[in-house]
Amino acid sequence: LLEQISDLYEEHKAEQNHEKKREIYRKIDEVSQEASKYAIANEYDKAISSLGASGTNAHTWFDETVYKNNIPNNELEKWLKIERERFSGMVLRLFHTELESVYEEFNRAQDNDSRLVNYELMDALFPLHPNGQQTTLGKAEHLRNPSMKAIHKYFDEYYVPNNYAFVLVGDLDFDATITLIDKYFGSLPYSELPPKNKIVEKPITEIVKRT
């Protein structure tokens, strides 16, 4: 079912006729309803909460995606087991409903004056660089035409062990903690990252005004 949903999103993205796009989206709704019978809502939160975790959250910014948890030190190994499973492969369960949550956040941002000012500022500072031309939330057309295949491709390319780091603080035995991390993450293979394109911005030599 997930593969079928993924294919439907690709079909929806490629279709130019608005009526046909609506028909495809109705099919996505239908198949997603069927797929939801095999998914557990908030599965990760439930698993983490069972360890006594608190403060579970995440944020994304220009150069980082950060996942946060407060874990009791006696549950560290169980937490690592869960994270190893999560970072070993991605399954986009309940993608349809999660997309709606992102839409809501995107819509709220359109009425947030501080965000709108920041968008204009970054656009003026970086007319060529993605930091100025691509907001963290993306553009409306991105959300209207999502691609599960593109998300999987991004995960496979960037969610690799040589591109992320653990930051652990608290009442920890350093040597034992490193041993546990090696146990669960040490076997994940190194993967070359996609090449970076160097973007050179021209110096700002005059006042830039936006209204």
What are these regions (language model features)?
Residues 1-74, 108-163, 187-211:
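Non-catalytic beta-strand/loop surface segments
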Residues 41, 80, 96-99, 118, ...:
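Hydrophobic face of alpha-helices
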Residues 67, 83, 102, 151, ...:
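Divalent metal-coordination and catalytic microenvironments
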Residues 69-99:
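M16/insulysin-pitrilysin zinc metalloprotease superfamily fold
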Residues 72-75, 170-175:
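Helix N-cap motif at beta-to-alpha junctions
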Residues 85-92, 184-192:
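A common structural junction motif
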Residues 100-105, 202:
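Acidic helix-start/capping segments at beta-turn-to-alpha-helix junctions
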